[in-house]
Structure formats: C-alpha cells, structure tokens
C-alpha cells in the first residue's frame, strides 16, 4: 500500500521542501485545503467506504501545521521525520496516523484530540523534571 502524508497549513515553500524531501521515500504528499477541513480524514486519504461531507468548510479552522499519515509503519514515520529535519522543514509537533477510530473524524476533531494529547504529554514531562 502507498504511504500518504497529508499536510495542513504549510506555506508553499515549506510544502515544496517537504515534497522534495519525501520523493526519494516514495511517500505521496497531499496538501489539505481549508475548505476540506470538515471532510472525514479517511475520505481525504482515499480510504474506501468513507463518504464525503456534503458541504465545503467555511469556518475559522486552525492555523497550526499538521501532518496526517496513512499506511505508515514506525520505520516510515521515522524516515519522514528525518527527511523533514534534513531538508529544513524541521519539527512539526502535530502529527497523526489515521486509525480505524480517527478515519471518520474531520480535521477539526483530529487537531483538537492531538492538541489535548500534546498538552497531556507536556504536563507529564514537566512533572518528571
């Protein structure tokens, strides 16, 4: 199965760098437009059986960069992270792999869950230090 990385809110220059860096890994890159933020992420990734939302998104959305991955192994995730660091894109804190649970979520639901997980992780790290 083909790996797909969906990029949210990346500038054209940062997206160009990412595409170039991921080309040797044969990872397909897709830019998700704001008008698609209400679509199920499984639909955006081309997962069979996931129906599209009827309307285009016209709300405020979110501005944070996010990468959503489909058909990735742990090794492929590591390769993606290394490639993005090497090409100058750098660290992208909000990353997710599509799961059977999240494939029906829209992008707003996903980013809310990611932010909550990220905050929880930061709290745990502060407690340890």
Which residue ranges define each predicted feature?
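Long, low-complexity, intrinsically disordered polar/charged segments
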Residues: 1-9, 65-67, 114-115, 128
